[in-house]
Amino acid sequence: MLEFFIEEKLLEDITMKEELLHQQTGINIQEKANLIWSIADSIRGLYKPHQYGEVILPMTVIKRFHDTLLPTREKVLEVYEKVKHLEVKDGFLQRASGYVFYNISNFTFDSLLADPDNIEENFLAYLNGFSENVQDVLKNFDFEREIRRLANNDKLYFIIQEFNSEKAYMGPDKITSTDMGYIFEELIKKFSESYDEE
């Protein structure tokens, strides 16, 4: 099921970067999965527990991409300003990001939270700033519908805020791709168990 929403080429690129670090992070998989699951509790009532995955899984993927790209964000934006008029610009932006994916939006989770009145519009603009390969991954979630639902019920800001906490950091310098895979498996298991409980 994990392959359904994460393209292998994106993970391979992150994995190559991790090998250069020459260290295992040794994070507590269960602890990180529990933290993410606790965020899901905030949408109780709006979603049934077995539906939490419709929000939590795409948000986890988005946060992973966000934290991975954050260190090279300024460089990508600088390069984008120079090449935005070109028809083919992916190679320049990929080199600037250091990955086979990038984001050209001016937003980060911090700046999204700084403008709560426009959080839905700005979050959609942030997602549209991702390279096409990431947008293809995100399309599998049909997440735009959930963003509207969260925004209409005053939950979108809170979800982004919780995913932006220091404990929810998911950059490859702290969480390897292998660990991330285990976290997803743990989350999927929790969603399945909650479905059985209903």
Language-model segments: residues:
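Non-catalytic, mostly N-terminal accessory regions of nucleic-acid modification and defense proteins
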Residues: L2-E198
